[in-house]
Swiss-Prot record:
Belongs to the universal ribosomal protein uS10 family. It comes from Saccharomyces cerevisiae (strain ATCC 204508 / S288c). Its main location: mitochondrion. GO terms for biological process: mitochondrial translation. PANTHER family: 30S RIBOSOMAL PROTEIN S10 FAMILY MEMBER (PTHR11700). Keywords: Mitochondrion, Phosphoprotein, Ribonucleoprotein, Ribosomal protein, Transit peptide. The modification Phosphoserine is found at S193. The lineage of its organism: Eukaryota, Fungi, Dikarya, Ascomycota, Saccharomycotina. The gene is RSM10. It is found in: Mitochondrion. This is Small ribosomal subunit protein uS10m. GO terms for molecular function: structural constituent of ribosome. Residues 1-14 form a transit peptide. One of its GO terms (cellular component) is mitochondrion. NCBIfam families: rpsJ_bact (TIGR01049). Present with 8480 molecules/cell in log phase SD medium.
Length: 203
């Protein structure tokens, strides 16, 4: 059906003598794409359909929409086709020998968006969802980058104290007597701690 539509457009274009507007003239050519500048991947748009013609038509529509919104897009990249087969009996009788095979192909396309503001990307998704085609499914994965912050909170003091104790023991590694005394002192502190004593209490 898509090939017939393209052939009909080409026939009408050759028969017409009027100049077309630029946006209408662009329909007869491949969709334009903006170059990738920073290489920042922001979204993956995966399309699925049982009919590859509608899938290619909708992919073309997404590329044109992204171009006019200023979004660099790559694709559509054909993904492996999923093939499913079922064998069922023709007769309602359970021991029937005649069987029938059914097969279904799921075609997939992948379009990637780059170097785009999240607000503009949401506008693209909203627009192509509003004008979606019947029989074509869409799944979008968003990628966002944020800073990593380390917040130890109340455990920071305990961690610093433990590190200071370890440093103190390593500083005494050449003095056996001082090291033995330091270790014994730490053992006594642990034995006198309330957390350790509560386990020694008889119930």
């Amino acid at each position: 059906m898509l090939r017939n539509t393209i052939a009909l457009r080409s026939f009408i274009r050759t028969q017409s003598t009027r100049p077309y507007p630029v946006n209408v003239e662009a329909v007869y050519y491949a969709p334009l794409k903006l170059p990738i500048k920073y290489g920042d991947l922001v979204a993956d748009i995966q399309l699925r359909s049982y009919d590859n013609e509608n899938l290619d038509f909708y992919s073309d529509f997404i590329l044109r929409t992204g171009y006019y919104l200023g979004i660099p897009l790559t694709g559509p990249k054909p993904l492996p086709t999923r093939r499913e087969r079922w064998t069922v009996i023709k007769s309602p009788f359970v021991h029937a020998k005649s069987k029938e095979n059914f097969e279904r192909h799921t075609h997939k396309r992948l379009i990637r968006a780059w170097d785009t503001n999240p607000e503009v990307l949401q506008m693209l998704i909203a627009y192509i969802t509003k004008h979606s085609m019947a029989g074509v499914g869409m799944k979008c994965n968003f990628f966002q980058r944020s800073e990593i912050s380390l917040d130890l909170g109340s455990d920071a003091n305990g961690l610093e104290k433990s590190l200071s104790n370890i440093d103190e023991l390593y500083s005494l590694r050449n003095d056996d007597k001082a090291q033995t005394s330091a270790v014994g002192q730490k053992v006594l502190e642990l034995l006198d701690s309330p957390d350790f004593k509560k386990h020694l209490e008889k119930k």
